Amino acid sequence: MLTIDGTFACASTGLEIHMIGTASHAAYPEAGKNPGPALARLLLEIEKLTEEYNRSRGFVRMTLIGMDIGSANYGVAASEGTLRMTVRAEREKVFAGYVDEIKQIAQNTADDGGFTLDIQEIERFPATENHAVNVDKLRKCAADQN
C-alpha cells in the first residue's frame, strides 16, 4: 500500500488561448491587428504570475506547449494566434485561483489590443489531496493488520 501525506497528484489542465485580430496585406501591417505581440506579452505575464504564486501561495507550474501565429503566407500579416500551455497546482483552491487569473489576464490583454478571445480548457483534472487525519487512519489500519 502506498500512502503519502499531502498532495499525491497536482490539479492540471491544458489551456488553449486563441486571439483573432484583423488581416492586412504584409506591406501595410498597421492596417490590421496582429495578435503576435499581445500573445508574447501574455506569455510573459503568465510567467510573472506563476513566479508570484510560487512565492506566496504554493506550488504552481506553467509549461508552454506551443504558440502558433499566422501562417506561411508571406503576403498577409498574421491575424490569428494561439498560445497553448499546461498549468498545474498542488492544491485545488490555489489551482482554481491561478487558472482564473490567467484567464483574466488573457481577457485584459485581448481587450487592450482589440482582439476576439477564445479560451478552451482541455482535460481538467482535480488535485488528489490526502488529508493527514485520513492518512493516519489508513496507516493505523495497515499496522493493525501486520
Model-derived segments and their meaning:
Residues 1-44:
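Fold-level recognition of mixed alpha/beta catalytic cores in primary-metabolism enzymes, strongest
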